[in-house]
Structure formats: structure tokens, C-alpha cells
Amino acid sequence: SGGEKVRCMLSKIMMGKPNVLLIDEPTNHLDLEAITAFNNSLINFKGTVLLSTNDRAFAQSVANRIIEITPNGIIDSYLPFNEYIVNEKVLSSREKLYK
């Protein structure tokens, strides 16, 4: 299955002990057990992880910095996701950058 292939690929990558991971939508096609295991491995990962995700719960659990790319610039913030989405400074920046 697609999820099994993703799990194998992620396991193979993590065993190589990289210091940077660049991953796009890593939780797609994974079941809850695999997402939890991957989440825990990212929390313990000592390197840098750049990821794109639409999974808010996943972002909240692993991200300590959020960089939002907009049509007119970027918003770079060292906030957990749940604080990022309600932060007044971020909301003001988003309003300006999405016009």
C-alpha cells in the first residue's frame, strides 16, 4: 500500500542519520500508528526539519518555528502552531501580505 511504502522510505531515511530533512506532506497515506511513530521520531530528531503540511495537529506537535510563504512575502515566527494562528502580529502581517 501507499502508506507502507511511505513508512519504509521514512525508516530508511531516518536510519541514515541525516542532519537535515526536507519533507512534503509526510503524514499522507499513513495510518495513526505510523503518524504517531513518525511524530515521535521527529520530536527526538537532533537536526533541522523543513516540512510542508496541512495537518494542523502534526504541525502543532513538531514545529517550533513556522515560515509562511505568501504571494507578497514571508512570515517567520518562532511560535507553536496554536499560538501562531491567533497571534496579533502574525494576523496583521497576514492581512498585509495576502492583499
Label for each model-derived stretch:
Residues 1-99:
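ABC ATP-binding cassette signature C-motif
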